[in-house]
């Protein structure tokens, strides 16, 4: 995976045609991610100033001519606006690679509850109760931006702002319920989070 050209200030996703063309994406709302055989990125969003608040919906099927071991590759970049992304997945075999370059912006990521793979981040990270309860046990944090194996999920986040990791529930197809997950955490109804070597704060939500 080559590093995206961060000097590009637009919001675009490469089309599947053989022509060198793109179509604009809305920076808010839902977007269905689809296999793009002629691009390094299956979804590419880069905007200098505007806030980004998107639900990226991963496919529940393999597209025609899509390699069996292909990970959906997504890039989101901004220079100043806050970033909020929900990675929505209903089929756990649809693995993904997500890279977020956010300069000084705060980033909120909702990762699917069946996430399994690695996370590399530059910036102070916080974790919601839902993330700790349902996701943390299947995550290992790395000091490098190695993309890892195609058979696992991978997230890379670089920002000088704050990163908030939250959980998107694959069973309810909705973001975590903060009150419910906080009660689970308080009364010990969830598995203990593994120790990590990173500096993180536990977020108690009311």
Regions found by a protein language model. Give the residues of each.
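Intrinsically disordered, low-complexity terminal regions
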Residues: 1-206
């Amino acid at each position: 995976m080559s590093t995206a050209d961060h000097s590009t200030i637009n919001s675009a996703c490469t089309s599947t045609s053989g022509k060198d063309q793109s179509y604009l994406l809305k920076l808010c709302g839902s977007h269905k991610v689809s296999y793009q055989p002629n691009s390094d990125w299956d979804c590419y969003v880069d905007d200098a100033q505007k806030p980004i608040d998107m639900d990226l919906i991963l496919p529940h099927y393999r597209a025609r001519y899509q390699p069996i071991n292909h990970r959906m590759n997504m890039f989101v970049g901004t220079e100043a606006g806050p970033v909020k992304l929900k990675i929505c997945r209903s089929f756990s075999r649809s693995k993904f690679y997500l890279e977020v370059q956010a300069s000084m912006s705060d980033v909120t990521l909702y990762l699917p509850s069946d996430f399994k793979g690695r996370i590399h981040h530059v910036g102070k990270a916080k974790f919601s109760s839902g993330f700790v309860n349902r996701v943390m046990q299947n995550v290992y944090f790395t000091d490098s931006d190695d993309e890892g194996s195609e058979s696992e999920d991978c997230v890379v986040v670089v920002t000088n702002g704050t990163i908030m990791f939250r959980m998107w529930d694959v069973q309810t197809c909705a973001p975590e319920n903060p009150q419910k997950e906080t009660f689970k955490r308080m009364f010990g109804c969830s598995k203990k989070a593994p120790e990590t070597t990173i500096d993180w704060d536990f977020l108690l939500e009311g």
